[in-house]
A protein has these predicted regions:
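Phosphate-binding active sites in nucleotide-utilizing proteins
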Residues: 179-285, 295
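PAPS-dependent sulfotransferases, especially Golgi type II membrane carbohydrate sulfotransferases
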Residues: 89, 101-116, 121-189, 236-242, ...
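Position-specific recognition of the canonical hydrophobic site in helix A of tetratricopeptide repeat
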Residues: 18, 22-25, 52, 59, ...
């Protein structure tokens, strides 16, 4: 109704329709998003961006045929748009005969190519060369892209160390039993956490394939609820001495009310905000019945997978330097060791390699931990039509495969700085 009012007051334009489509797409209302993108296209039929936006919706819901149809139309209009080329590469497995590979390399080498476009091309070429098994050509492009990102977004790894120092200091005397009977008892979200590229999307897809579960993706509301309840900035940690029983109830109620409002229809909801493990102690006190699933993966494969992906600007800034990656990972291990000691029964850990080697055993373990009865369709997670917005969008739309295991062996010499950092 709000947008109907806006359209009556404002002159209808493609730009306005695109903005509304973006809002609905972000809210995972794919059909409504497509409706507004189509309205925009009626006004500007040659606008390449609209084709790309439609392609993005189709990719998120797993319709790769329409995805490629739309992105190819966008590329036909703007053949040298590197964002479109990157999108194309990330929407299918690239064969060695695909002309896009040499086209991207030509653009990469062109002097007039901007620094940012060269970064995008570096990651896109990496994906294309790996798909086509041209592994010996990969690393110069991958390293160039990461080095440039590291220059654009410098990161002091001491930030991760000091943040964990604070967590350990504030929760040094934490005992979950001290909070028995407190918090919001009715709240039971399922938090899926871990390092990026560790398999969290796969785990969420398996669990959310259950008829009683809605997969909400990366919600990120827990930090907001904590911040506005206790009066701290969203990402600032707080001492337990400032947390009162009524705070815990309010935090839990805020999170659960938000999830139930935005993701109605099922009794269980997953939140794949992967960094939530840092707030595990406080959230377990605020919601005694919430679940935490920590996904672990061989760090050599996990960190390589991080290194070969470009994240949203100003996020995961440790990702673009091998030494920083190793140090950050060791800090992840450090804080998980801390929580394992403080709340050993507060979460379960699942190993990515175990999951793909024996899917049913470990999928059943996950479903059982969530207090749900087993459903066979949890093993057919790739058939789910829910919208997915992560870098793993291609992988979780197909049955479990093992080609990503020991991928680090292809680049063993190039990754030596990383291996030394995680020793």
């Amino acid at each position: 109704k709000y947008y109907e009012t806006v359209f009556k007051q404002e002159q209808k334009s493609a730009e306005l329709y695109i903005k509304v489509g973006d809002i609905f797409n972000k809210a995972t209302q794919s059909n409504t998003a497509l409706k507004y993108y189509n309205l925009a296209q009626e006004i500007e039929p040659s606008n390449a961006l609209i084709f790309k936006l439609k392609a993005n919706v189709y990719r998120e819901i797993g319709d790769f045929s329409k995805t490629l149809e739309q992105i190819n139309k966008a590329i036909a209009i703007e053949p040298n748009n590197v964002d479109f080329l990157m999108f194309y590469v990330n929407s299918k497995k690239i064969e060695s005969t695909d002309l896009v590979i040499e086209k991207m390399i030509t653009l990469f080498d062109r002097k007039s190519t901007t620094k940012n476009d060269r970064i995008t091309l570096g990651f896109a070429i990496t994906k294309a060369l790996e798909d086509s098994k041209q592994f010996d050509r990969v690393f110069p492009f991958l390293k160039s892209a990461n080095d440039s990102m590291n220059l654009n977004f410098p990161y002091d790894v001491k930030t991760a160390v000091s943040e964990n120092d604070e967590i350990i200091k504030y929760f040094e005397d934490f005992k979950l039993d001290d909070y028995s009977g407190m918090g919001h008892i009715k709240a039971h979200p399922i938090f899926i956490c871990g390092m990026p590229r560790s398999g969290t999307t796969l785990v969420e897809q398996i669990i959310s394939s259950h008829s009683s579960v809605t997969g909400a993706g990366e919600v990120g509301h827990a930090n907001i609820a904590i911040g506005r309840t206790i009066g701290t900035k969203e990402k600032k940690l707080i001492s337990l001495s400032k947390v009162q029983p009524e705070h815990l109830e309010k935090i839990g109620s805020d999170i659960w009310t938000y999830l139930r409002h935005h993701y109605p229809g099922t009794s269980h909801i997953t939140d794949k905000s992967i960094m939530t493990y840092k707030r595990m102690g406080l959230l377990k006190a605020a919601m005694p019945n919430c679940k935490f699933i920590i996904v672990r993966r061989d760090p050599r494969d996990n960190l390589l997978s991080i290194y070969r992906n470009r994240f949203v600007d100003n996020t995961h800034l440790y990702a673009y330097n091998l030494q920083n990656l190793g140090t950050y990972y060791k800090q992840f291990l450090r804080i998980m060791d801390f929580w394992r000691n403080k709340i050993p029964d507060g979460f379960i850990e699942i190993n990515y390699e175990d999951l793909i080697n024996d899917p049913e055993t470990h999928a059943r373990k996950l479903i059982n931990y969530c207090n749900l009865d087993w459903e066979d369709k949890c093993l057919e997670f790739y058939k789910s039509e829910r919208q997915i917005k992560t870098l793993s969008i291609l992988q979780v739309r197909q049955p479990i495969y093992k080609s990503s295991v020991k991928a680090w062996e292809r680049y063993e010499q190039d990754l030596q700085p990383l291996f030394k950092a995680i020793e």
